Every structure is written in C-alpha cells, then in structure tokens.
C-alpha cells in the first residue's frame, strides 16, 4: 500500500466502532435501543428521544445521490491529482431516509453523476488502519 498523504478521519469514542467496521468492510450505524431510529453521525445519545441505549446495525450497501458538488479547485495539495472529483450526499436504502452520508462517487466520470442516481458501496483501504466508504454507480 503506497503512502497515503490525504487527511484521514480522526475517530472519537462514539465513531471508533464505525471506523472499525469500515476496516472490516461493513457499513453500520447506531440504532436507538428505545425509539429504533438511526443515529447519524455516531453520537452518545439519540437526537430523537435522548436515550443512551443503542446497538450497531449493519446498513444497506446501496443508496441514492441526494446532492453533490464537483470539486475543481485544489485547496489541499494532496488532492491535486484528483480534481475534478465528486463529493456527494448519499441517502442509504432501508434507513427511512434517516441516513445521508457524505462521501465520494468514484469509478465514473464526474459529468455522469446525477441527483437520484443509484449507487453501490465500495470500500477503499487507504492505510493499514483506515478504510473509507465510497460509492460507485450501479
């Protein structure tokens, strides 16, 4: 694996289990143990009912592009070889529209990305410790 020079996520006590599961190529989120709604991003208590109870739940590997931008300007030198690239809000299937993740749409020309486009999860192992969830067209 080549040296990865881009910024990496900095997990905290709430998000570390999410990143651990990504490393195992599993996308998951907290689901409230009282009201049953998803918590996204991971956090200590439910934003809906304020319960501290939760369980980690495996999520769908498919979703839909809700919104996106195409980055053309290099603000961080490590991304110079990537422009233009797509940063998208992906609404995950089977979450009752409760989870919209920010990620990249890859493996397609940026000109082909559209709102409403169905996408599938792919994992990118960027270091021996960090795996990033990204999406590609279905």
Show where each model-derived region lies.
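Flexible extramembrane loops and terminal tails that flank transmembrane helices
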Residues: 1-27
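Residues immediately within or flanking Cys/His clusters that coordinate Zn2+
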Residues: 26-29, 43
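Short, cysteine/histidine-rich loop/knuckle motifs that typically chelate Zn2+
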Residues: 31-34, 45-51
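Short functional micro-motifs and their immediate structural scaffolds
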Residues: 40, 54-55
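Residue-level recognition of beta-strand microenvironments
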Residues: 62-64, 68, 124
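Glycine-rich active-site loops that engage anionic ligands at enzyme catalytic sites
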Residues: 66-106
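Well-ordered alpha/beta subsegment
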Residues: 100-138
């Amino acid at each position: 694996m080549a040296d990865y020079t881009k910024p990496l996520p900095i997990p905290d006590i709430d998000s570390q289990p999410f990143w651990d599961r990504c490393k195992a190529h599993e996308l998951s989120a907290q689901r409230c143990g009282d009201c049953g709604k998803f918590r996204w991003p991971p956090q200590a208590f439910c934003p809906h009912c304020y319960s501290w109870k939760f369980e980690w739940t495996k999520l769908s590997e498919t979703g839909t592009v809700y919104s996106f931008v195409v980055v053309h300007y290099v603000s961080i030198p490590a991304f110079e070889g990537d422009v233009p690239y797509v940063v998208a809000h992906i609404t995950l299937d089977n979450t009752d529209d409760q989870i919209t993740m920010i990620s990249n749409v890859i493996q397609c020309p940026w000109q082909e990305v559209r709102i409403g486009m169905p996408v599938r999860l792919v994992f990118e192992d960027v270091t021996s410790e960090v795996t990033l969830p990204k999406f590609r067209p279905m």
